[in-house]
Regions:
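Hydrophobic, Leu/Ile/Phe/Ala-enriched alpha-helical segments that form helix-helix packing faces
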Residues: 63-75
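Feature for intrinsically disordered/low-complexity regulatory segments and propeptides
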Residues: 1-66
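Intrinsically disordered, low-complexity regions enriched in serine/threonine
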Residues: 1-26, 83-86, 98-296
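Generic structural hydrophobic/aromatic packing signal, biased to beta-strands
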Residues: 38, 93-94, 116
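A short acidic/basic microdomain associated with nuclease active sites
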Residues: 72-98
């Protein structure tokens, strides 16, 4: 991951200073096939998870920059840009602090984050409006909120579709108001943390082995410790014997565990990998459903 203090376009261009090129695949003795693979120009690493046909046109860094430019045309100049490459381009764009929203007191605030994904898996670009919570440094994406996700129709030549891109980012900007309202509703809704966790992570079966029981207990303890730390940091009162907390806190405790504390295999322990893995984790999605249901 890289972060540099130049213009957003220059940051992206410097981070992705290579092309992704398509080359034909051959069979034994040079036999021709209809299949192609993609390779990075700087290190010759294979990109993507399968072969493509001759019709496939891989996107390039300038396409990613076009999306960043469209983002800035709607959200104004980015205060920070971070980049990551794993079988595709990932960029997070941080709009200015004027979009900050206070959720509880002065120490629990949320900020919008635009997550741009341009993979080489034959799917379109997509952009997700995420929530960055400063109290725990979680970057969460509420998948069930439709205004926070846009699929980009084009896979290359995005510079020629700027009007369309800007319109899609306008939709995401409107989605920030929706997210703010939902988060305030989650903060106002009380849940039992014990019941919440039992819904997300059911108790192991009676015949489960000791290892399953230990994993379940250790996970629960880590989530409760995270919850307690965040309550102290945000100035909330101590939890009483009913273990009642806001749905917002309960969701963040689960999401934060999967982003920061859950075991990750070697090579997938970086900040961006953890964000992406947490977003795909089934317990995080279950926690989102429960928190939004409580806030409805």
């Amino acid at each position: 991951m890289s972060t540099v203090s130049t213009s957003a376009a220059d940051q992206v261009r410097a981070a992705f200073d290579f092309t992704v090129d398509k080359f034909p695949l051959s069979g034994p003795d040079g036999m021709r096939t209809p299949w192609y693979a993609m390779f990075r120009s700087d290190n010759n690493e294979v990109v993507g998870e399968g072969s493509v046909t001759s019709r496939y046109v891989p996107h390039q860094t300038e396409d990613v920059i076009a999306l960043v430019d469209a983002c800035e045309s709607v959200f104004d100049e980015a205060s920070q840009v971070k980049t990551h490459f794993r079988n595709g381009h990932y960029v997070t764009v941080s709009p200015s602090d004027e979009y900050r929203r206070s959720i509880y007191g002065s120490n629990d605030n949320i900020f919008p984050r635009l997550i741009i994904r341009g993979g080489y898996d034959r799917s379109a670009f997509n952009v997700t409006l995420g929530i960055y919570r400063d109290a725990c440094m979680n970057l969460a994406m509420l998948r069930s909120v439709t205004e926070t996700y846009q699929s980009i129709r084009h896979t290359s030549g995005l510079r020629f579709a700027m009007d369309e891109l800007v319109a899609q980012f306008e939709t995401l900007k409107n989605g920030w108001n929706t997210l703010e309202s939902l988060v305030h509703n989650m903060q106002a809704a009380d849940v039992s943390m014990v019941d919440f966790l039992n819904e997300v992570y059911p108790e192991p079966d009676a015949d489960a082995g000791q290892r399953a029981v230990t994993i379940h207990r250790n996970r629960t303890e880590k989530i409760f410790r995270r919850l307690q730390r965040e309550r102290i940091k945000t100035g909330r009162p101590a939890i009483d014997s009913s273990f009642t907390v806001s749905a917002w806190e309960a969701y963040n405790a689960v999401q934060g565990f999967h982003q920061w504390d859950a075991p990750r295999r070697e090579g997938f322990k970086g900040e961006f990998d953890r964000i992406l893995q947490a977003a795909k984790a089934q317990p995080v999605r279950k926690a989102e459903d429960l928190a939004l249901a409580a806030a409805a």
